[in-house]
Amino acid sequence: MKAGVSSACLYPLHTEDSVRAIAELGVKNMEIFINDISETEGEIFEDICRIKEIYDINVMSVHPFSSPMETLFLFSDYDRRRSTFFDMYRRYFDCMTRLGAKIFVLHGAILSAGCSDEHYIEQYLKLCHIAEEYGVTVCQENISYCKSKDIAFLKKMKKECGGRAKFVLDIKQAVRSKLSPFDIIDALDDSIIHVHVSDHREGADCLPIGDGSFDFSALISRLRATGFDGGLMVELYRRNFGENKELFESMKKIEALI
């Protein structure tokens, strides 16, 4: 297992500046949140790559800004939109090969879209097939306003994808869905290969590690029992912490439990 920090924590700072700021804290494992498609190529992308090399960063995962578009494009009934989407996401996968990132985080269709399970799984597998060409694994994240908030649906994905479905466990999203992260682990077992960590308590669902009451020791023990050997990425919203050093401190608290 490896503890790290997501560059999403410093939004709306430009992505390259977020990566640099987190690297300067001493963080070595990172998830990069791409905030615009322009950041997957050209001078901006080269700057991100330079920062990665200078600070010897292990980029474990990439999260796209375009998650809200997945409903309208990937899970649409309109074939041209899906084709456009696949072309766009190839750009993410291509830049991931340069960054060395292996995990791509997918939110998927929102609940109100009414996307059928069958259509969802079909399109997910098509995206997985494309990602595999680049050595990338598409991981479904549990999201409180998406189909993926439902444990039964996640279990169906796991079963019907024949072992190809992989998952990101997000603790704050589980809390917002009124689910126990432990129940999600029990349901998905070794299909969980990446985790977004944050603490919580009554009335506050996204806090630095140690500022809430969640039992991270039990979480790591349960994950270890499944054979989990992935990343535990601190992912907080900018309004939920003060100084940047709190991100590093949160990561170190997780690291101490691994």
What is each of the regions a protein language model found here?
Residues 6-10, 33-37, 64-67, 109-111, ...:
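Active-site beta-loop-alpha junctions enriched in small/polar residues
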Residues 42-43, 73-75, 80, 114-119, ...:
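Short, solvent-exposed loop/turn segments at secondary-structure boundaries
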Residues 16-17, 54, 71-166:
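Active-site acidic/histidine proton-transfer and metal-coordination neighborhood
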Residues 47-54, 123-130, 183-184, 218-222:
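Catalytic-core regions built around general acid/base machinery
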Residues 1-4, 11-26, 100-101, 150-169, ...:
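Histidine-acidic metal/acid-base catalytic patches
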Residues 1-91, 97, 132, 166, ...:
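N-terminal pre-domain/capping segments
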Residues 28-29, 58, 102, 137, ...:
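Residue-level detector of anion-binding/catalytic polar loops
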